Amino acid sequence: MSLDKQLKDIIDSDLHRYGYSSEGQMGFMTKRECYGYRYSKVLRKCKWYREHDKKILFLFERVKLRMLSEKLGFQITYSTQIGRGLYLGHMGSIVVNWKAVLGDNVNLA
């Protein structure tokens, strides 16, 4: 399995928690309004690029992660270990320690 395929599978498992089987099912406005999924997607990409030495992509995603963190009130670092199926249920003040280990299908709401 290629690295990009693995990243896509992880992101799709997060998307499944929001009730969609693929991004194609989501309309444009749904993508804009689904803040938890937007944040988790950028978080996953940031972590992935950091671990696989893709520095330019990592820096780009890190800036996006920082902007979304400030906008939404989420403080979850890319170094936090998170299993598949992350669900962020609401906007505003969600803080996770960088040493935390979260399993599969975790709800943070």
Predicted regions and their residues:
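Terminal amphipathic alpha-helical/low-complexity segments used for targeting or macromolecular assembly
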Residues: 1-72
